[in-house]
């Protein structure tokens, strides 16, 4: 069968691989148009660039300004992809648009447009040729273009390029774990020291490295362990390599077995690493060549060689139709709106550019601009609308609101400014305060400038208004506030009219001075009452005590310590009745040995009262308390009973009327006055205290301790609960500071054992549950008490 068939001879393909152009009958319409465009391009390449008739020397391509250049490049890109029909459509649709005059051959920018069009067409053909080569087919039109390029460049194309297998992208090989490159300039001794140290660090860990660096800190041979040293990187690389050797990965043995069985894998790894190194070197060399080429091109540019193409004159009336400039708020608002739109609206991709022509792009841009303006107008209207009025009920003034809102346990003192800062705002306060180390100086300088100004600041205005509101409740307040302010003012006025009390400071040396002050003050008070005969207060005798306040315990004067005598005048040995008038200059107090023999006759029907008791004193007269007492700062020391003012010396009072009985003596008489003053305060005998361990065993568990507040005579106490009596006095002061806002270092606690030290426990001083401690303030710079 095969022998009867005729075998026709076929021509062998040419050696250059080019089969020649296809006949016109086999071409499609698109290929025909492309062939025509190719012919026009070849003609344009052969023809010299169009010259523009000017008055100066002949010039080549004129580059348009940036805005027109963008339109030219976009148009050339679309025309190179879609053909000349697209260019004709653009000319028809934008006939009256001056921006598209570059499409006319008489325009000076037409040469630049033709240049860009040729450039984009060449790029498209290069891409199409690469695609055809990968598919194994050849386009005769592209072959013609390639031949032209080869003729222009006098280079022979590579015919075997289409038959080569495309190279795969190289992947980075595994990092070299066991290879460390030696740095330049290292000596043999330094290398040995670094290697030995790296071996010990890899074996013993980071603790060995830390200890060695601390011990050999001043040794220059071990400075390579410092991160700032040039050999530190080499040292750490050695440590990592030795660590990999001492602790290899689990799959290392399996890899070694495979490599020993098949040496081809080892050779492939070596070749792969070689190719990778070559590619890295080539890439590095290419980058260097590009930088050098760019530098040479920049150096070849003559920056002083330019030609004035056209000069534009701006008339003064051209800016009349322009909108007024935007304010800063409008610019910020528009930038925020555009940023939000960029986040919400997806940027149109390059796929849309293929389907939209220049006119459609313009319409879309104008629509977007109009939408932005409408949104900006809406935003301005929203901002211009006033917020609705809000009515607040149960409103309180800021000064009344502060005590309820401020919690002393959640406020700390700033170490920089000394202000009270909430705990939750302390970190931000410290961050702001530490931004500038001269913050305090700048703040003081700013306040100094503020003081020099004549205008008050906002804070001062607010304070002035608050003060005015307090002084004028008839304007800013209610009737109740006005009445309460009037009552307070009357009370303060009465307090100012009352004479100041003479207070004994508790020292033995100041007893006489304090007594003389009290005598002179009471003498001035009696001068006003001597003329009133019917006043019962003008008669000698015990004065009526003021009624005690409800809820306040009666405080009786304490007797002075033994052997303590006031510097008072001694009475002469003469007897007088307690209620009878006395001669001037004669005191009522008598020696003890004479008063035991006196009796007081009374009216008929009344029993005689014996005078064998200690000398009586007026209830209104208070004996100075012992040193350290809690009443030392609050008691008054008037003149003793029977002492007359100096102004009344030499005058005699009339005898009492017959039938009048002297007032009865007080129910309780104070003890006799001491004879000799005490030189030193007596100390509390600590041996009388129960030992601390025994006291803790008797009083286990938490306890409540009562502490009297300073400068308060209404008998108020605050109760402090401690978890155990083993707590020291300092912790108790901290709890007190949280209650009354007095720093612990300003507090002074005293009890039955005297003043309490901060480092001692409560059980040491036998302070139990329910015991009352006296709180006073520690004074700086005063005399030691």
Curated annotation (Swiss-Prot):
SURP motif repeat residue intervals: 71-113, 193-235
Subcellular localization(s) per the UniProt record: Nucleus
Keyword annotations: Acetylation, mRNA processing, mRNA splicing, Nucleus, Repeat, Spliceosome
Site feature (Critical for binding to SF3A3) residues: 196
Listed GO MF terms: RNA binding
Superkingdom in the source lineage: Eukaryota
Matches recorded under PROSITE patterns: SURP, UBIQUITIN_2
Residues modified to N-acetylmethionine: 1
UniProt-listed SUPFAM superfamilies: Surp module (SWAP domain), Ubiquitin-like
Biological process, per Gene Ontology: mRNA cis splicing, via spliceosome; mRNA splicing, via spliceosome
Pfam families membership: PRP21_like_P, Surp, ubiquitin
GO cellular component: U2-type spliceosomal complex
Biased composition (Basic and acidic residues): 677-686
Region named Disordered: 1-42, 124-175, 522-554, 639-713
Pro residues bias (residue ranges): 543-554, 653-674
InterPro entries cross-referenced by the UniProt entry: SF3A1, SF3A1_dom, SF3As1_ubi, Surp, SWAP/Surp_sf, Ubiquitin-like_dom, Ubiquitin-like_domsf
Domain Ubiquitin-like, residue spans: 707-782
Subunit structure: Component of splicing factor SF3A which is composed of three subunits.
Comment on protein domains: SURP motif 2 mediates direct binding to SF3A3.
The protein, known as: Probable splicing factor 3A subunit 1
Organism of derivation: Arabidopsis thaliana
Origin organism lineage: Eukaryota, Viridiplantae, Streptophyta, Embryophyta, Tracheophyta
């Amino acid at each position: 069968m095969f022998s009867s068939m005729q075998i026709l001879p076929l021509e062998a393909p040419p050696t250059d691989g080019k089969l020649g152009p296809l006949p016109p009958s086999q071409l499609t319409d698109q290929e025909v148009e492309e062939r025509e465009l190719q012919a026009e391009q070849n003609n344009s390449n052969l023809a010299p660039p169009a010259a523009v008739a000017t008055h100066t020397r002949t010039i080549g391509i004129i580059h348009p300004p940036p805005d027109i250049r963008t339109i030219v490049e976009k148009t050339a890109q679309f025309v190179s992809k879609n053909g000349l029909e697209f260019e004709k459509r653009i000319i028809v649709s934008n006939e009256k648009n001056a921006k598209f005059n570059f499409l006319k051959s008489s325009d000076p920018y037409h040469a630049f447009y033709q240049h860009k069009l040729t450039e984009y067409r060449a790029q498209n053909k290069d891409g199409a040729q690469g695609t055809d080569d990968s598919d194994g087919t050849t386009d005769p039109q592209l072959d013609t273009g390639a031949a032209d390029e080869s003729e222009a460049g006098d280079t022979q194309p590579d015919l075997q390029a289409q038959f080569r297998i495309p190279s795969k992208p190289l992947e980075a090989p595994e990092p070299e774990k066991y290879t460390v490159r030696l740095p330049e300039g290292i000596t043999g001794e330094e290398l040995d020291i670094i290697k030995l140290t790296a071996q010990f660090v890899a074996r013993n860990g980071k603790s060995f490295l830390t200890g060695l660096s601390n011990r050999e800190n001043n040794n220059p041979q071990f400075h390579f362990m410092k991160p700032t040293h040039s050999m530190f990187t080499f040292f750490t690389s050695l440590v990592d390599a030795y660590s990999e050797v001492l602790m290899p990965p689990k799959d290392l043995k399996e890899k070694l077995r495979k490599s020993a069985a098949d040496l081809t894998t080892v050779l492939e790894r070596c070749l792969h690493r070689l190719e990778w190194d070559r590619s890295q070197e080539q890439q590095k060399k290419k980058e260097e060549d590009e930088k050098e080429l760019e530098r040479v091109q920049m150096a070849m540019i003559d920056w002083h060689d330019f030609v004035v193409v056209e000069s534009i004159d701006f008339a003064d009336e051209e800016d009349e139709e322009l909108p007024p400039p935007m304010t800063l708020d409008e610019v910020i608002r528009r930038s925020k709106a555009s940023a939000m739109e960029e986040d919400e609206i997806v940027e149109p991709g390059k796929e849309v550019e293929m389907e939209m022509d220049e006119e459609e792009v313009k319409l879309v841009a104008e629509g977007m601009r109009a939408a932005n303006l409408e949104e900006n107008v809406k935003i301005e209207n929203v901002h211009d609308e006033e917020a609705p009025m809000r009515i607040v009920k149960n409103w309180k003034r800021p000064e009344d609101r502060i005590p309820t809102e401020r919690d002393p346990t959640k406020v700390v003192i700033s170490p920089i400014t000394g202000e009270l800062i909430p705990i939750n705002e302390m970190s931000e306060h410290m961050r702001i305060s530490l931004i500038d180390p001269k913050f305090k100086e700048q703040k003081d300088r700013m306040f100094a400038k503020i003081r020099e100004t004549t205008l008050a600041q906002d804070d001062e205005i607010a304070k002035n208004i608050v003060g005015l509101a307090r002084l004028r409740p008839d304007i800013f307040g209610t009737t109740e506030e006005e009445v309460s302010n009037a009552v307070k003012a009357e009370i303060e006025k009465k307090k100012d009219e009352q004479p100041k009390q003479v207070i004994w400071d508790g020292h033995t040396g100041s007893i006489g001075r304090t007594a003389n002050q009290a005598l002179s003050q009471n003498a001035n008070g009696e001068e006003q009452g001597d003329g009133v005969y019917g006043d019962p207060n003008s008669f000698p005798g015990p004065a009526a005590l003021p009624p005690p306040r409800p809820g306040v315990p009666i405080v009786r004067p304490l007797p002075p310590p033994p052997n303590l005598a006031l510097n008072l005048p001694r009475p002469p040995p003469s007897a007088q009745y307690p209620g009878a008038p006395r001669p001037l200059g004669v005191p009522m107090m008598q020696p003890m040995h004479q008063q035991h023999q006196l009796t007081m006759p009374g009216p008929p029907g009344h029993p005689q009262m014996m005078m064998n008791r200690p000398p009586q004193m007026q209830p209104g007269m208070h004996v100075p308390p012992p040193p350290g007492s809690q009443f030392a700062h609050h008691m008054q020391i008037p003149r003793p009973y029977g002492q007359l003012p100096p102004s009344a010396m030499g005058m005699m009072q009339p005898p009492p009327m017959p039938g009048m009985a002297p007032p009865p003596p007080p129910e309780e008489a104070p003890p006799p006055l001491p004879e000799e003053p005490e030189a030193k305060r007596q100390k509390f005998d600590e041996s009388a205290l129960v030992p601390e361990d025994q006291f803790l065993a008797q009083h286990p568990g938490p306890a409540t301790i009562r502490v009297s507040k300073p400068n308060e005579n209404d008998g108020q106490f605050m109760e402090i609960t401690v978890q155990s009596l083993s707590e020291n006095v300092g912790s108790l002061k901290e709890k007190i500071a949280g209650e009354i806002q007095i720093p612990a270092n300003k507090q002074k606690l005293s009890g039955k054992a005297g003043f309490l030290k901060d480092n001692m426990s409560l059980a040491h001083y036998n302070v139990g549950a329910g015991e009352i401690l006296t709180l006073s303030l520690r004074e700086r710079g005063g005399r030691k008490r």
